[in-house]
Amino acid sequence: MEIDLNADLGEGCGSDEALLDLVSSANIACGWHAGGANAMRDCVRWAVQKGVSIGAHPSFNDPENFGRKEMDLPASDIYAGVLYQLGALSAIAQAEGGRIAHVKPHGALYNQAARDSKIADAIVSAVHDFDPSVAVFALANSGLVTAARNAGLVAVEEVFADRGYRADGSLVPRKEPGALLDDEDEVLTRTLAMIREQRVQAVDGQWVSLNAQTICLHGDGPHALAFARRIRGALQDAGIEVHAAGAARA
């Protein structure tokens, strides 16, 4: 049994280099919600040194809201914005001896793509035109998974052990009760259940089936790094191997 562990990096949380010792895939911010050229270069260099798969973490151009404000943009704008961010990170990766292996949208772009086919198709088109061998990390069971596979791309289905789920498989919005789980023992139990049983309990008590191929470890917060170490240790104790997912392993 195996799983991919990913983390969002280059966002100013300060623990990027240490997190890269724990994860198999890194989603690197491309400057539109956080980060910048130097942060991107640092994260890419560390990822190459540690053998971690490099991924782009594009977003809406919204640093004021950390990319978490929903936007209604033309598909052409979304396509161009994603392609622009991929190009920036790709240039840095090439200079450091690496390459982009996957793309995981950030924040509102990620959440809207899960339910809005126009946005999902625009992201997928940008990834396909950039490099059709690049995988797309998407919320499990979401429209972005479907769009990626329809375009012939590898879709890697992502789950969140520390986020609340609705019965339809969507994440509870961050501002609503039950959105974020802070009981570490509960999160560890959910993590193992997602991998072994391929399901998660929603906030209303219903069980949601999902295909857990990669799990996001959040790096923001005072105890995030220590908790990430607990999760990695629990997986090791359970005999679950950690490997980069999908096309990211190529």
Swiss-Prot record:
Catalytic activity: 5-oxo-L-proline + ATP + 2 H2O = L-glutamate + ADP + phosphate + H(+)
Protein name in the entry: 5-oxoprolinase subunit A
Catalytic activity, EC: 3.5.2.9
An example Gene Ontology molecular-function term: ATP binding
Entry annotated with the keyword Hydrolase: yes
Pfam family for this entry, one: LamB_YcsF
Domain of life: Bacteria
Function: Catalyzes the cleavage of 5-oxoproline to form L-glutamate coupled to the hydrolysis of ATP to ADP and inorganic phosphate.
Family of the protein in this entry: Belongs to the LamB/PxpA family.
Record keywords: ATP-binding, Hydrolase, Nucleotide-binding
Any one of the GO BP annotations: carbohydrate metabolic process
Quaternary structure note: Forms a complex composed of PxpA, PxpB and PxpC.
Family matches, as Gene3D superfamilies: Glycoside hydrolase/deacetylase
